[in-house]
């Protein structure tokens, strides 16, 4: 049984880790950390966990953490980088759901996140945890940088095209929409009900922090520099993400067949039939990514949807854990979507 600890267990991604890991046949949560709620009963703070979790929250310095086989950091950027070394030195595996190890260049990271990276030497060892791209590296990793939600949706939609070199890599447009849970659980005026209800707005246009990690991986896949324009939007729903990506084809091939063949053996990526378009409701509560394709002359639109908290965060983290421990990557993650 894999002994699991979660640091930052009261945010949306931390709570989703608890929910998913409870049903994992090979994992057992032994430590849930929260500075604010230390010593408080988990079920008193989160009644949805009554009869499922019989633990009290502990501080991140709790000795129990050193009994873990793996620790998930479901924390804001800047937290994991100052804490992981003491666990790695004890041969405890780490998955960081934050952004601390996603960008390989510490100077570039500091530019986007506004602070100095204190563990630049670990960046070279961290593996970007997108199993559909770095599967073999994840299996041998001890430190995983779990991808952001936007990068996950964008990269999965573009991977087959970049690997076959059939699109212009300088004119890609990513038009993305996210549910409000992507902003986290902390109080914020911008995500209050009255601010987001019946409203749709772009934000951080081409300046979102997820852009550099996306560009880094797309360039790695293509083997040459990839540039893209990125407009994220906030939509008035709790969870879900849609990425509509516009590209110019430089070769005329059957793109539908290309995608179907590319992902035919993949557990979580599903290519929809021609003229069937993805919707966020179809993947809600799952680790799936649905992809639809529409071609018009030399233009191609790829549409991908994910649950931003599961495939975009906690589910993907568990998928990575499975690979790190030599398990089937889908273990504990094959839920059917919620409908309605």
Swiss-Prot record:
Entry keyword set: Amino-acid biosynthesis, Arginine biosynthesis, Cytoplasm, NADP, Oxidoreductase
Xref: NCBIfam families: argC (TIGR01850)
GO molecular function annotation: N-acetyl-gamma-glutamyl-phosphate reductase activity; NAD binding; NADP+ binding
One term under GO cellular component: cytoplasm
The name this protein goes by in its record: N-acetyl-gamma-glutamyl-phosphate reductase
Protein's UniProt keywords contain Cytoplasm: yes
Name of the top EC class for this enzyme: oxidoreductase
One Pfam family it belongs to: Semialdhyde_dh
Native species: Vesicomyosocius okutanii subsp. Calyptogena okutanii (strain HA)
Pathway annotation from the record: Amino-acid biosynthesis; L-arginine biosynthesis; N(2)-acetyl-L-ornithine from L-glutamate: step 3/4
Catalytic activity: N-acetyl-L-glutamate 5-semialdehyde + phosphate + NADP(+) = N-acetyl-L-glutamyl 5-phosphate + NADPH + H(+)
Domain of life where this protein originates: Bacteria
Claim: Cytoplasm is one of the keywords in the record: yes
Annotated GO biological process: L-arginine biosynthetic process
The protein's role, per its UniProt record: Catalyzes the NADPH-dependent reduction of N-acetyl-5-glutamyl phosphate to yield N-acetyl-L-glutamate 5-semialdehyde.
Entry EC number(s): 1.2.1.38
């Amino acid at each position: 049984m894999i002994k699991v600890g979660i640091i930052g267990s009261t945010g949306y991604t931390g709570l989703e880790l608890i929910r998913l890991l409870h049903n994992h046949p090979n994992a057992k949560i032994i430590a849930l950390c929260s500075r604010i709620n230390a010593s408080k009963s988990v079920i008193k703070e989160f009644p949805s966990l009554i009869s499922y979790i019989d633990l009290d929250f502990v501080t991140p310095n709790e000795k129990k953490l050193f009994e873990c086989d793996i620790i998930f950091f479901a924390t804001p950027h800047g937290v994991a980088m100052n804490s992981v070394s003491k666990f790695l030195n004890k041969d405890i595996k780490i998955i960081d759901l934050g952004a601390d190890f996603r960008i390989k260049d510490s100077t570039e990271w500091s530019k986007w996140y506004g602070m100095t990276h204190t563990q630049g030497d670990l960046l070279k060892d961290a593996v970007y945890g997108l199993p559909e791209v770095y599967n073999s590296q994840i299996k041998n990793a001890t430190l995983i940088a779990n991808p952001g939600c936007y990068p996950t949706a964008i990269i999965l939609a573009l991977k087959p095209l970049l690997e076959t070199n059939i699109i212009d890599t300088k004119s890609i447009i990513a038009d993305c929409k996210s549910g409000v849970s992507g902003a986290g659980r902390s109080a914020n005026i911008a995500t209050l009900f009255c601010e987001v209800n019946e409203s749709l707005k772009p934000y951080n246009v081409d300046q979102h922090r997820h852009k550099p990690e996306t560009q880094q991986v797309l360039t790695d896949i293509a083997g040459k520099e990839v540039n893209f324009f990125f407009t994220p939007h906030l939509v008035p729903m709790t969870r879900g993400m849609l990425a509509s990506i516009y590209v110019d084809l430089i070769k005329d091939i059957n793109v539908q067949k290309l995608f179907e063949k590319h992902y035919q053996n993949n557990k979580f990526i599903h290519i929809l039939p021609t003229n069937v378009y993805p919707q966020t409701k179809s993947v809600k509560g799952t680790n799936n990514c649905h992809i639809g394709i529409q071609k018009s002359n030399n233009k191609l639109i790829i549409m991908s949807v994910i649950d931003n908290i599961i495939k975009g965060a906690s589910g993907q983290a568990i998928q990575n854990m499975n690979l790190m421990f030599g398990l089937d990557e889908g273990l504990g993650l094959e839920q059917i979507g919620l409908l309605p």
